[in-house]
Amino acid sequence: MESRVLSSGATAISGVPRLTKPAGRITTTTVAVAFPARLNATGGNVVWGRQLRPSLLNLDHSSPVSLVTKPVKRDVLKPCSATASDSAGDAAPVGFLAKYPFLVTGFFFFMWYFLNVIFNILNKKIYNYFPYPYFVSVIHLAVGVVYCLGSWTVGLPKRAPVDSNILKLLIPVGFCHALGHVTSNVSFAAVAVSFTHTIKALEPFFNAAASQFVLGQSIPISLWLSLAPVVIGVSMASLTELSFNWLGFISAMISNISFTYRSIYSKKAMTDMDSTNLYAYISIIALLFCIPPAVLFEGPQLLKHGFNDAIAKVGMIKFISDLFWVGMFYHLYNQIATNTLERVAPLTHAVGNVLKRVFVIGFSIIVFGNKISTQTAIGTSIAIAGVAIYSLIKARIEEEKRRMKSA
């Protein structure tokens, strides 16, 4: 609503009183109401980029808005001095991390790789003197659940409420997560870490197959062709792997299938819950599924000689500390991976995920001194290259779909 000033020389309109200039100087000022970032005066979200008309805002809630108000004498507000980051003077100074976001993203990638490598190395060291993957899988999830419960207690983050409908959607996700996690650890305990990760490079193949034949989605021929090097590379590595055994191979394959169905059920269980709370609830559900088989398959052996043998080899303090830290590293690297995905584009995350697998395979070979044949090394390299090509093509297809939807 624009205000209009009637000059004293204008002709008066019949029926409308003539406005006279009041005594004293009237200064018209524009009052800028500064709200905190993202919040307005009532706590709602502010939609930036739109100017709210002053006449439509009733800042004084004790009285209704009057269409005709008496002129009020106000002092002229002196403009605030502009900050270094905003010439208008209405924004707070930009912090160092906000000014250089790539440093924060780089830190997330570093922590993701570091925690993942440490987890895989410590996990394999535990299996060298305590070969009970079902029990260790329970410890992984239990430490993470305790961590989540502690975080909820202090409100970092605030616990998201759940109802029976959400739980019905999350239970299949938690079951697939539990099955994939346990079978991965069975494979880690049975064969070399590098070989397990080479087999797990086939996971994109199972994802594509499930999308095509289970969900009925059309997979481009370019994606199928990019998976050929993955299958060939894993086959080459498996034929000459020195630590090969069928338990480790089949367990890793079941893990691939389980995580594929976890992805399918996750898409069906999409909620407005943030990733931290969502992963916490999935961990709790997965823990409940992991406890019965651990008690059934390994309980008697653990009580008979499992715990005593481990304590005799490394001592009780180291045994307990190893179990605690391997569980903590497992939870943190999964949480950091989720946070990293939220910060970068799918293409960047896909490349980072491939490089992470390369780091894990390389460091595990160096730390444990695993001897690999030339054919295994070539096959592993071909498989990793195929995963990289597949991830790049898939990420670009997803980006094109988002651009078409936004256009």
From Swiss-Prot:
GO terms for cellular component: chloroplast membrane. The record marks S222 as: May be essential for binding and transport of phosphoenolpyruvate. Residues 82-101, 156-212, 298-375 are chloroplast intermembrane. It is a multi-pass membrane protein. GO terms for molecular function: organophosphate ester transmembrane transporter activity; phosphoglycerate transmembrane transporter activity. Residues 1-81 form a transit peptide. The chain crosses the membrane at residues 102-122, 135-155, 213-233, 278-297, 376-396. It is found in: Plastid, Chloroplast membrane. Residues 123-134, 234-277, 397-407 are lumenal. The keyword Transmembrane applies. Keywords: Chloroplast, Membrane, Plastid, Transit peptide, Transmembrane, Transmembrane helix, Transport. The keyword Transport applies. It holds the Pfam family TPT. SUPFAM superfamilies: Multidrug resistance efflux transporter EmrE. Its main location: plastid. Mediates the export of fixed carbons from the chloroplasts into the cytosol in the form of triose phosphates. In addition, it can also bind and transport phosphoenolpyruvate, thereby increasing the photosynthetic efficiency of C4-plants. Homodimer. Belongs to the TPT transporter family. TPT (TC 2.A.7.9) subfamily. NCBIfam families: tpt. This is Triose phosphate/phosphate translocator, chloroplastic. It comes from Flaveria trinervia (Clustered yellowtops). The lineage of its organism: Eukaryota, Viridiplantae, Streptophyta, Embryophyta, Tracheophyta. The gene is TPT.
